Swiss-Prot record:
MF annotations from Gene Ontology: DNA binding; zinc ion binding
CDD domains in the cross-refs: KRAB_A-box
Single Gene Ontology BP annotation: regulation of transcription by RNA polymerase II
Similarity comment text for this entry: Belongs to the krueppel C2H2-type zinc-finger protein family.
Pfam families: KRAB (PF01352), zf-C2H2 (PF00096)
Listed transmembrane segments: none
Sorted UniProt keywords: DNA-binding, Metal-binding, Nucleus, Repeat, Transcription, Transcription regulation, Zinc, Zinc-finger
Cellular-component GO terms for this entry: nucleus
UniProt name for this protein: Zinc finger protein 227
Amino acid sequence: MPSQNYDLPQKKQEKMTKFQEAVTFKDVAVVFSREELRLLDLTQRKLYRDVMVENFKNLVAVGHLPFQPDMVSQLEAEEKLWMMETETQRSSKHQNKMETLQKFALKYLSNQELSCWQIWKQVASELTRCLQGKSSQLLQGDSIQVSENENNIMNPKGDSSIYIENQEFPFWRTQHSCGNTYLSESQIQSRGKQIDVKNNLQIHEDFMKKSPFHEHIKTDTEPKPCKGNEYGKIISDGSNQKLPLGEKPHPCGECGRGFSYSPRLPLHPNVHTGEKCFSQSSHLRTHQRIHPGEKLNRCHESGDCFNKSSFHSYQSNHTGEKSYRCDSCGKGFSSSTGLIIHYRTHTGEKPYKCEECGKCFSQSSNFQCHQRVHTEEKPYKCEECGKGFGWSVNLRVHQRVHRGEKPYKCEECGKGFTQAAHFHIHQRVHTGEKPYKCDVCGKGFSHNSPLICHRRVHTGEKPYKCEACGKGFTRNTDLHIHFRVHTGEKPYKCKECGKGFSQASNLQVHQNVHTGEKRFKCETCGKGFSQSSKLQTHQRVHTGEKPYRCDVCGKDFSYSSNLKLHQVIHTGEKPYKCEECGKGFSWRSNLHAHQRVHSGEKPYKCEQCDKSFSQAIDFRVHQRVHTGEKPYKCGVCGKGFSQSSGLQSHQRVHTGEKPYKCDVCGKGFRYSSQFIYHQRGHTGEKPYKCEECGKGFGRSLNLRHHQRVHTGEKPHICEECGKAFSLPSNLRVHLGVHTREKLFKCEECGKGFSQSARLEAHQRVHTGEKPYKCDICDKDFRHRSRLTYHQKVHTGKKL
């Protein structure tokens, strides 16, 4: 096409110069990528759209760029669902649309007498009128396509076309008055160029924003005489010569992308750094409103600044306004977000699901917090002790421990708490509220976590395992406390004596030793205890409650410790060994008590008689000798006992139970001690030796009685005549002389006896029983004394 020169009037040149010097939409546009747009909330998107539309309207008002930018259309498309026409309705309008496009396309594109600026203004004016007028049938998304081979004007889908006979398009290959020839960079061939009218009739991006024609319009300030130029090149007026189409000699050092001319290259690194540049400071300030950091609204109460979306919610904190109400329960919320999350309580909706364990959550914040359980991420560290936390709020609460801060005070007892949740739970101690009930046994709890742990008592679940010994626990805290057995850690120190304890509760109990305080009193017997748990355990003595049952034999126990001790009988396990004698024990406490036998240590001394004991339980039982206390009463005869074991043994008198059987002779015994002594009669074992004469005895009591023969001690005095005896049995026999009382009567002959042993010996006369046999001649005797007398015949001792 031959080059042409166009002389424009002076006024038109001045107008064009002013138009070219004005800012373009690209200068004021704020461009976000799709990824950046997704990070904006609804309020920020609306603000972004308003800013873009305002800038766009300002440019339209001065007659520049009457086409809505892609970015604005994209935002509007995300917020509004366009009404879609049916295929029948759309096809009926294609012909009218094509006719309208044909009119102004042929009118201006075929006119070779117009300059490129005039063509631009005329086409823009027609397109603007089509946008504003209601007579136009053009819709969003339509386009004009000029075929590269046949010069057709087609709709976007290519299903309807209007052929332009032998039409040349000088607009695409126009030699402007400045002397530069402008060609499209990618799609210009010998005869035509595609034009798309997208998003409210926006001209194709290659022509509008990227073509050399568009670049020239922005930079050229004054029309110049046109010069001839070879096809496909762009030659400037001065020394700035641009390269042939397609060549990009300026590469980016970061990603290798090429640019056809160098002015574009300094702006490209902002893609990698995320930096955004603006031609005017006002544009930068406008853009900064998009970011959440911008504080546009100031609170008069606190002086804090907030963006528009957060300001209303923050003001509600001061006013207490809760304008969003739940239709189901009437609960109020200061923000719509809080109401939406609350609705899920009624609907049960939990849209956030953990891929690791499948657990669902109603709030994304709870879901994110839960995920740190799997990742074990604890990004918030305490500067005092180095402890890590998954959330900053937990760190702030923890820091109150170091500061000693307890902002939540109980008005009833004055106790302070670091957390509001702990304070609310504590208040139930005063109100007695126990809203969490066990489905199995009906037991109530003041908060949920003890109920969860309690249910494991019924299920037997022990999810927390010790890595050292494999022992299981129902609670994580119990595992931590148990682990101190292996590490020997005792973090709780007594300020009085410096003694260390592995548990805080043990320290509190120990401190009562120094204070002597026993706050918990038994209403039945008045006995005091330093711990409420010990009082509850003690009350089972009066109620007879035995909640702990052995699964093997069905025996019941009042205390869990007694059950555990009993279970060792079935397992036979004795893991604690004495290093001195090798004897095994089921419990460490029994081992410690046994070791005092070797060391001779007796730390428990009676202040009344100065008698010492190696075990605390023996000391407490002994004290009842002085106090006369006999708390264990027989329900049949009312007899009292100082020990529960004494009561249990006594009850066998009424029941006739003799659980201990001799394997040799089959004789039964009520007491284990009697059974042991009896067995020594068969074995001949006499472990207790007299140091004076070497005589042996099967019982320690008999040894003590014998030693009085050597010492001459006779502690048992008759109050009637003052006669003394070494044995209490001898005193009782003697008392029958004064009273002549014979309480024990023989049912066969009516003879009376002062002692039950005498009655039993007498009854053998009637039964013919002779239990004492001579080992040498097998002769039988009714009485032991007769056997002893007979044995002297064999030994040759004088009778």
